[in-house]
């Protein structure tokens, strides 16, 4: 088996019987006995492969995260971690202003990752605040703000997260 990273796959290659037998990336075509799709919950490749449509909004969440750079000693001191250990916190209720979802924070050696995850349906309906505002509010919460004080934001990211379990996986 061979794993190839960093190549955007444009389409799947099918043989005469319709079996997937590889991928197409730009002008390159790579054949394979097995192709594993890793393009996320809203997979355009799965739609192409088996006609799978995007999952319902009620079964998908959106997560946003920021990474705050601090030196290793500051991270350990602020989160009361022993040498070589880390911490992980989960937040419910106030982190998403009462709508479906929650917040999270975990340590890395020289940084703290902080984020929120909330249902897309709640975001689209206008029931809650926008997800970016939820993250801003969490960053300013009196329990969180001192932990990231004077830290430099070095990364922002966002992802769609499946919440429907195996029931929303496309058929094989």
Where are these regions (language model features)?
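Flavin (primarily FAD) binding-site architecture
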Residues: 37-52
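FAD/FMN-dependent oxidoreductases across multiple families
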Residues: 97-99, 122-172
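Hydrophobic residues embedded in beta-strands of well-ordered beta-sheets
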Residues: 19-21, 112-113
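Active-site substrate-recognition segment that forms the wall
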Residues: 85-121
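N-terminal Rossmann-like dinucleotide/flavin-binding domain of flavoprotein oxidoreductases
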Residues: 1-2
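Core beta-strand elements of the Rossmann-like FAD/NAD(P) dinucleotide-binding domain
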Residues: 25-34
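A conserved short coil-to-beta-strand element within the FAD-binding core of flavoproteins
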Residues: 5-19
């Amino acid at each position: 088996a061979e794993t190839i990273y960093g190549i955007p796959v444009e389409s799947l290659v099918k043989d005469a019987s319709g079996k997937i037998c590889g991928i197409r990336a730009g002008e390159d075509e790579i054949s394979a006995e097995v192709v594993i799709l890793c393009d996320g919950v809203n997979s355009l490749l799965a739609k192409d492969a088996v006609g799978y449509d995007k999952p319902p909004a009620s079964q998908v969440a959106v997560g946003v995260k920021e990474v705050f750079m601090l030196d290793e000693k500051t991270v350990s001191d602020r989160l009361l971690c022993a040498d070589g250990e880390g911490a992980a916190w989960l937040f419910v209720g106030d982190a998403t202003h009462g709508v479906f979802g929650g917040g999270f924070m975990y340590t890395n050696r020289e940084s703290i990752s902080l984020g929120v995850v909330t249902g897309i349906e709640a975001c689209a309906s206008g029931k809650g605040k926008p997800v970016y505002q939820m993250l801003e509010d969490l960053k300013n919460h009196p329990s969180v703000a001192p932990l990231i004080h004077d830290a430099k934001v070095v990364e922002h990211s966002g992802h769609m997260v499946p919440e429907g379990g195996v029931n929303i996986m496309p058929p094989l």
